[in-house]
Regions:
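Short acidic, glycine/serine/threonine-rich loops at helix termini
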Residues: 6-12, 39-42, 63-68, 91-95, ...
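Terminal amphipathic helices with adjacent charged low-complexity linkers/tails
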Residues: 20-123, 333-341, 370-415, 605-627
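Short beta-alpha connecting loops at secondary-structure transitions
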Residues: 50, 86-91, 179-183, 243-254, ...
C-alpha cells in the first residue's frame, strides 16, 4: 500500500539500494493483508532481528499484531517500534500521513543509533539542514476557495437582516467564511438536526438551513422529517442547482425537479413552500407544484425569506438556478443557449465604491488600477453571465447585446509554416538518472489538472515512467490546485507519487499566489528549483469582501525568488488574452515557455501529440503551446 511506497521512496532518497541495504543489515517486508497477519511469514522474517520498525498510517493495527505474534518466540527481535519507540516516546503519529521525508528521517535516525555509518549520517544532516520554511507569511494575498462567477449560491445563501443560517455539505458551505451570518455544520444528511436540540437553549426562535439538492435526495429529507416531528421553527433553503457541482456536475440521483420536491415536502406536512428562481417565467401557469407553493424572482428573495421566518414550524424555500460551472460546460457544448449579452463597467464613470461586488459577490469583478485610483472591471474570460452585478444602483454599468468580444486573429497552428520555429534552439535534454519532479500550481477551474495530464501523456508517449497526483478538492472553486508530476526513465524508479519536501526541480506557477503558500514553498529548494511563474496579479476572493484589499505582488515575487535557484516571471495571462482573446490559454502558453527553456523532460513533439489526443480546443492549445 501507500506506506510501502513511501518507504521505498525514502530508501531511494537515502541512496540505499539492495547492495547497500545488505551491508547495513536492512531488510524490507511488504504486508499484503493487514488483518489478520499471516503468522508464519512474520515469524520467519522477524526472528533473530535486532530491531523491527513498523511503518503504517493511522492506528497501530499491524504493529500490535507483530508484537503479539513475536512475544513468545525464542528468537524475537530486541525491539519492535512504530507509533512509539523503546523508551515509550512518540515516534510516528496516528494522525496525518506518512511522507518519504519523514520516513527517511526515521530510518536514518534508527540506523545511526547503532551504526555510525558515515553515508547515512551525512544524509541525516542534509535532511535536517533542508527543513523548509513553511511559516505563514503575513501581508500577502491568499488563494481561498470561493463561489464561482455567477454561482447561484451568491444570491441564495443571503439571509435577511436579523436572521442567521447554518451551513451544510456542498459548495454552499463556503458561505461560512463569507459575510453571510452563516455558521455551524453537520455531516451530510443531518442538516438542521442540530437545531432540534439547540433551539431550546438559545434566544433566537428561528434559523435558516442551507441544503443542496444532491444532499436532499441522498439523505437530507430525513433531517427535514425530524424537524417537522420536533415542531421547531426552521426554514430549509433547498439549493436546486441542477447538478452535484462539487463532485463533477452529475445530476442528483432520481433526477428530482423543484415541482417533485415540493410535492414530497407537502406530503411530509410542510404547508409553506416558496420557489425562488432567476427565471420564474419558465414555469408557466400550468406547472404542477404542490398546493400553496409561491413562485418569485430572485430579486424578491429578501421579502420571501422575511415571510418564511414568521411561519411557525418548518418552512421551505426552493432556490432554482443552474450551477454556473455547469452552465458554462453546457454552453460550450451547445447544450444550453448562450445569452447574446455582456455587461461592462465604464471606468470613466466608476468611482470604485465596490457596491457591484457587494451586490453580486462575484469574483469576475476585478480591480482596475488607474491614475485616479482603484476602479472596477468585468473579467470577460471568467464571466458566466449571471448579471446580478448590474442590480446595484450604479450608472457605470453598460449592457451590450448583439456583440462579441473582439479577438486578435491568430493563425491556426495547422496553418503555420512548418519551419517557423526551426531557428529556435532545441530544448536541452534533462538527465533522468533520478526522477524529475514538477509541481504545477494554479487556480481551480483554469486547466491546471489538464496540464498535469498532458505532461503525463507526453511522458507515456516517450515510454518514460510517470506519475501524476492532483490535489484539488474544493479548490476547483477558485482555490489553490496542485499537480505533482514525477518523470523518470522507468516506472521502477518512481515509488511515491508525491513530490517530497525541498525536492521540486520545477515549479510551474500558473498563479503566483499559490506558489507562496506553505504546501508549495516546502517543496522548493534554493539550490535546485527552477521556477517559471505567471506573474499576472489575478485577484483573490478577499477583494470581493474588502474593496481595498492589497495583493502584495512585489512581496510575492521576492518570496518566490528567495525560494528558487532561478526564477522566470512572465505575464502569461496578458499575453494569451491579447493573442487569443481568452485567458484560458495562459496555462498552455507558460507550459510551452517552460519546455522551450529546457525545464520539462519531454520533447515538444510529444506534448503536441498529447494535446491532439486530448481533443479539446486543439488548435488554440497548439498555438498557445508553440508561441
Amino acid at each position: 500500500g501507500k506506506a510501502y511506497a513511501e518507504v521505498r521512496q525514502a530508501l531511494s532518497d537515502l541512496n540505499i539500494d539492495e547492495t547497500y541495504a545488505e551491508k547495513l543489515g536492512l531488510h524490507l517486508f511488504k504486508v499484503g493483508m493487514p488483518w489478520p497477519l499471516e503468522e508464519s511469514k512474520i515469524i520467519e522474517f522477524c526472528s533473530n532481528m535486532e530491531e523491527i520498525i513498523v511503518f503504517e498510517e493511522k492506528r497501530p493495527l499491524i504493529e500490535d499484531q507483530v508484537k503479539e505474534i513475536m512475544f513468545n518466540q525464542a528468537n524475537r527481535p530486541q525491539r519492535i517500534v512504530g507509533k512509539r519507540d523503546e523508551d515509550n516516546k512518540d515516534l510516528m503519529a496516528s494522525t496525518g500521513e506518512l511522507t518519504p521525508d519523514f520516513v527517511s528521517e526515521v530510518i536514518a535516525e534508527r540506523i545511526t543509533k547503532t551504526n555510525k555509518d558515515e553515508h547515512i549520517l551525512n544524509k541525516l544532516r542534509l535532511i535536517k539542514q533542508n527543513e523548509p520554511d513553511t511559516a505563514v507569511i503575513e501581508g500577502i494575498a491568499n488563494r481561498t476557495p470561493y463561489f464561482c462567477s455567477g454561482c447561484p449560491h451568491n444570491s441564495s445563501t443571503k439571509v435577511p437582516e436579523g436572521s442567521k443560517a447554518m451551513a451544510g455539505i456542498g459548495c454552499h458551505f463556503m458561505a461560512a467564511w463569507m459575510d453571510r451570518d452563516t455558521d455551524l455544520f453537520t455531516h451530510m444528511g443531518a442538516e438542521g438536526a442540530n437545531w432540534i436540540g439547540m433551539s431550546q437553549f438559545v434566544e433566537d426562535d428561528h434559523i435558516f438551513q442551507n441544503i443542496g439538492d444532491g444532499t436532499y435526495t441522498h439523505s437530507g429529507i430525513l433531517a427535514i422529517r425530524a424537524a417537522v416531528a420536533a415542531k421547531v421553527n426552521i426554514t430549509y433553503k433547498i439549493l436546486f442547482n441542477d447538478a452535484t457541482a462539487m463532485t463533477g456536475g452529475q445530476p442528483a440521483e432520481g433526477v428530482p425537479t423543484p415541482a417533485k420536491i415540493s410535492h414530497q415536502l407537502f406530503g411530509e406536512g410542510i404547508k409553506r413552500i416558496a420557489v425562488v428562481s432567476d427565471e420564474p417565467e419558465k414555469y408557466g401557469i400550468n406547472t404542477n407544484f404542490a398546493e400553496g407553493t409561491t413562485i418569485n424572482h430572485r430579486s424578491e428573495i429578501d421579502q420571501v425569506q422575511k415571510d418564511l421566518r414568521t411561519w411557525p414550524g418548518v418552512t421551505v424555500m426552493i432556490y432554482d438556478q443552474t450551477c454556473a460551472t455547469e452552465k458554462r460546460r453546457r454552453r460550450k457544448r451547445g447544450l444550453m443557449e448562450d445569452p447574446d449579452k455582456r455587461s461592462f463597467i465604464n471606468d470613466l464613470v466608476c468611482e470604485g465604491c465596490g457596491d457591484c461586488s457587494k451586490t453580486s459577490n462575484c469574483v469576475s469583478i476585478e480591480p482596475l488600477e488607474t491614475k485616479l485610483g482603484r476602479k472596477r472591471k468585468v473579467n470577460q474570460s471568467t464571466c458566466n453571465k449571471d448579471f446580478s452585478c448590474v442590480d446595484g444602483f450604479c450608472p457605470s454599468f453598460v449592457t451590450v447585446q448583439g456583440a462579441t468580444i473582439k479577438k486578435r486573429k491568430v493563425t491556426p497552428a495547422s496553418d503555420l509554416p512548418k519551419n517557423i520555429f526551426d531557428k529556435l534552439p532545441k530544448p536541452k535534454e534533462i538527465n533522468l538518472e533520478k526522477p524529475f519532479d514538477i509541481v504545477v500550481t494554479g487556480i481551480g477551474g483554469t486547466g491546471v489538472v489538464t496540464i498535469g495530464a498532458l505532461i503525463g501523456m507526453a511522458s507515456h508517449i516517450e515510454n518514460k515512467g510517470v506519475s501524476v497526483l492532483d490535489q484539488v478538492g474544493i479548490a476547483q472553486k477558485g482555490g489553490a490546485v496542485l499537480s505533482h508530476i514525477r518523470v523518470a526513465e522507468s516506472p521502477k524508479s518512481i515509488h511515491s507519487v508525491k513530490v517530497g519536501k525541498t525536492s521540486a526541480d520545477l515549479i510551474l506557477g500558473c498563479d503566483m499566489v499559490v506558489v507562496t503558500s506553505s504546501p508549495v514553498r516546502e517543496l522548493m529548494n534554493i539550490n535546485t528549483t527552477q521556477s517559471i511563474i505567471n506573474d499576472h496579479e489575478t485577484p483573490v476572493a478577499g477583494f470581493v469582501l474588502d474593496p481595498d484589499h492589497s495583493f502584495g505582488g512585489k512581496r510575492i515575487r521576492q518570496i518566490i525568488e528567495k525560494s528558487s535557484k532561478e526564477t522566470n516571471f512572465i505575464n502569461a495571462i496578458k499575453i494569451s488574452t491579447a493573442m487569443f482573446g481568452d485567458s484560458i490559454a495562459s496555462n498552455m502558453f507558460i507550459t510551452g515557455y517552460a519546455l522551450q527553456k529546457g525545464f520539462i523532460p519531454v520533447k515538444p513533439e510529444s506534448m503536441e501529440e498529447a494535446i491532439k489526443l486530448n481533443n479539446m480546443a486543439v488548435d488554440m492549445n497548439l498555438s498557445a503551446f508553440r508561441w
